Amino acid sequence: MPQSRTHSRTATKHIFVSGGVASSLGKGLTASSLGQLLTARGMRVTMQKLDPYLNVDPGTMNPFQHGEVFVTEDGAETDLDVGHYERFLDRDLSGQANVTTGQVYSTVIAKERRGEYLGDTVQVIPHITDEIKSRILAMSGPDLQGHRPDVVITEIGGTVGDIESQPFLEAARQVRHDVGRDNVFFLHVSLVPYLAPSGELKTKPTQHSVAALRNIGIQPDALILRCDREVPPALKNKIALMCDVDVDGCISTPDAPSIYDIPKVLHSEGLDAYVVRQLGLPFRDVDWTVWGNLLERVHQPRETVRIALVGKYVDLPDAYLSVTEALRAGGFANRSKVEISWVPSDACETEAGAQAALGDVDGVLIPGGFGIRGIEGKLGAIRYARHRKTPLLGLCLGLQCVVIEAARSVGLDDANSAEFEPETTHPVISTMADQEDVIAGEADLGGTMRLGAYPAVLAKGSVVARAYGSEEVSERHRHRYEVNNAYRDRIAKSGLRFSGTSPDGHLVEFVEYPADQHPFFVATQAHPELKSRPTRPHPLFAAFVDAALRHKLEERLPVDVHGEERAAADDEIAESADRDEVASVDSAG
């Protein structure tokens, strides 16, 4: 007879989050919020996303299909949910946090070619599922600081019933068998639709979703009941009975006013306490000090500021998810609500178009992107912000567009990027040397950009150095093109200052117009939005929103000859910022 296994109750616990009925129910936010609650109870939590698509990573996927690509410190291109994980846990994750079917199959096929399966017939079970399990269990190993997590939360992408998700669900089922049932918790997110004609909430879709999960061999321990309203106790009892789940494990999650309210919603329903009891974790009260301060700033802003996001993919806001969350966090730092005006970059190609799109905003943000479409509109928005003294922040492609606009302003009329016009006579933005084979089609496109965290040195006394409070910083990157150093001196005649470079001085990382020329005009080749946290806003975004507030208040309170109204504006800004209450941000953001 096979020997029975013994499992330690002190082992790392695994929580699997699956979804049913429909996609886009908020599995990622649910998982992130539960992670935040467990972290607030004093536990060390890490998270992982299993994506069932065949792409190796989302790096080459259309932003309109996938949304943004979130880059980790170690340079992995990952799903946007990993950004939620980092923001809610307030910790950096690695490339291990995102596993795709493409990665799994690539690894298994490579092992087969090397003969590692000793002549076995390679199959989905056990070879694919074993590879998935190894990646799940690897998350319970020590992190860079040598600490093992108390809890690993793994979100399984897709919907129960999808063909693509079946190997991942089977692997999760096997993990429960391998590490012990007491060490695994299955949380299933399901839709409870409301039918307006009959005025009823319907439980049948959830029942069918759980039945499909059971057919795979997984009995959920708790259910997240997604609805646009509270699920009444009678329906909770019915769902608990029909799905064989404790009533305490049936969690009603109506739509919340803010994503940062979701931890409070889950806590009020008792989910975190239920998980702690079921897994035998140490029971500590939730420390709401940090998150409660955040919610106060979310719901009690003292000012409102309007920021134009001038982008190419504005029809799908998820394409700029980290940017919008970083803007909102910059607002939290200044006790302000940030309203985002989504501006298609094409709308700003003409001066009249830029005036119509940007005339009523307090700041302009130029985000990253690829390709020539909409570039002239971005240049028009930059020109408008420069002439009108409207605060501007450029990110990645935003820096490249700022440099092109500055070059054209000093007589290099056909200045352009080698990306948009390879034959331009003035390639002020050029292809990085190690990217030329990729551009020529002689190397892989995916996973070959300049990716991950890189250091930069900032000029003493510069706007960016003052914003960071340091002259040495580190930011994450994702690009193939750089400022052409042959044009630095000529571009500098426009007044644009190259205020931050790589430590060797070769790569331009930050540009700006000095404070005596413009109230705030900064651009970076990096993606600082990826390091922003709601509880620790990134200093560049905090400074940008602060400048936008000043711009707004100066419009409201014009300067008189004695400067009295300027002083009044400064007092109002100082009160609204209230920076002493914001957690300090280190030089790395």
Curated annotation (Swiss-Prot):
Known function: Catalyzes the ATP-dependent amination of UTP to CTP with either L-glutamine or ammonia as the source of nitrogen. Regulates intracellular CTP levels through interactions with the four ribonucleotide triphosphates.
Binding annotation for CTP: S23, D162, I163, E164, K202, T203, K204, P205, T206, Q207, K238
Keyword Ligase: yes
Residue ranges of the TM segments: none
InterPro entries noted in UniProt: Class_I_gatase-like, CTP_synthase, CTP_synthase_N, GATASE, GATase1_CTP_Synthase, P-loop_NTPase
A GO molecular function held by the record: glutaminase activity
Record Gene3D superfamilies: 3.40.50.880, P-loop containing nucleotide triphosphate hydrolases (3.40.50.300)
Misc. comment: CTPSs have evolved a hybrid strategy for distinguishing between UTP and CTP. The overlapping regions of the product feedback inhibitory and substrate sites recognize a common feature in both compounds, the triphosphate moiety. To differentiate isosteric substrate and product pyrimidine rings, an additional pocket far from the expected kinase/ligase catalytic site, specifically recognizes the cytosine and ribose portions of the product inhibitor.
Catalytic reactions on record: UTP + L-glutamine + ATP + H2O = CTP + L-glutamate + ADP + phosphate + 2 H(+); L-glutamine + H2O = L-glutamate + NH4(+); UTP + NH4(+) + ATP = CTP + ADP + phosphate + 2 H(+)
Protein name: CTP synthase
Positions of region (Amidoligase domain): 1-281
SUPFAM superfamilies: Class I glutamine amidotransferase-like, P-loop containing nucleoside triphosphate hydrolases
